[in-house]
Design a protein with these regions (language model features):
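Receiver (REC) domain switch-region micro-motif
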Residues: 36, 49, 134
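Metal-associated gating/positioning segment near the N- to mid-region
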Residues: 42-106
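Histidine/acidic-residue-rich, glycine-tolerant segments that coordinate divalent metal ions
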Residues: 87-96, 102-160
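Short strand->helix junction
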Residues: 9, 55-56, 141
């Protein structure tokens, strides 16, 4: 696919060639097989990353699911989200991660899942998963009773 005459974020007007899901080239007078779209100098931006979302599934799908949250993200130009761990159950064990990942299969965008730390977290099983980060470590209470004390915080930092 080729997008001609697109205004980039820095104000330059260029052609953008896309191969599959990746930008292949940015320049002038590019050629490509397949669809050609004239952007007519409209702004063309890459997909955004929202590294801090709170999809409430599992535990509270009446508030938001991976499907509804990711649909909203995609509508706003977000192509990757990272969900925070304070759900019910909190994402503090490998089993809880697996449960959340099953829900995330309904996502319409790429995603990452943050792990969390609680007094009963299981770092061995949690950190064996593709956890994006240990996100939102709470020194006060939050959804999922995720508040921890300073000693556990220090231990979590060393394990991560």
């Amino acid at each position: 696919m080729l997008v001609r005459n697109a205004t980039l974020a820095d104000g330059r007007v260029r052609d953008v060639r896309i191969d599959g899901e990746r930008i292949d080239a940015v320049g002038t007078d590019l050629t490509a097989e397949g669809e050609v779209v004239d952007a007519d100098e409209r702004l063309l931006l890459p997909g955004a990353v929202d590294a801090h979302v709170h999809f409430r599934e599992p535990g509270a799908p009446h508030k938001e699911t991976w499907r509804t949250g990711s649909r909203s993200a995609a509508a706003g130009g977000v192509t990757t989200v990272v969900d925070q761990p304070n759900t019910d159950p909190p994402t503090t064990t490998g089993a809880a991660y697996d449960q959340k990942e099953l829900c995330a299969d309904d996502a319409l965008v790429d995603y990452g899942i943050n792990g969390g730390v609680t007094p009963d977290w299981d770092p061995e099983t949690l950190l064996d998963r593709p956890v994006f980060a240990l996100g939102e470590v709470f020194l006060a209470d939050s959804t999922g009773e995720m508040g921890i004390d300073g000693d556990l915080f220090e231990d979590a930092v060393h394990r991560a």
